[in-house]
Amino acid sequence: MEDERYGEFEGPDTIQAVTAALERLGANVELIDVGPDIYYQLDKRKAHIDLVFNNTEGLEEKELREAIVPFFCEHLHIPYTGSSPKTFINKMDKATAKRIVAYDGVPTARFQLMVPGDQLGDLSFPLMVKPYSEGTSIGIS
């Protein structure tokens, strides 16, 4: 079985295809691994960065991992693609995300935030059970 921790990471073929497409458009592309030193890596290159094409899933097993690169880019005043740190933080908290979209009138299914030991309450089967802080299908079996 594939390791769920890496379920959202892009494979080498996708990274190469995006790199090639950007280079065909005349971009000088440099791939930067997202590791514990990502702030330093961005800071030392910031004078030469026109845009960070942010496709990172961030640091392994960190709840706010997707917000790290956009946060650092904003702090260093480096333009980047994708969502803001606040958006990434809100989308990783499913209850908050559902409340935000419901407030704006987007229909959303009823939900209940559960912690170990909680009772099901008034929800009935069929149900979708999803970890509150994961993206895509991580945590669903």
What are the functions of these language-model segments?
Residues 29, 79-80, 108, 127:
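Hydrophobic beta-strand scaffold residues
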Residues 45-46, 89-141:
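Active-site nucleotide/adenylate-binding loops and adjacent lid/helix of ATP-dependent enzymes
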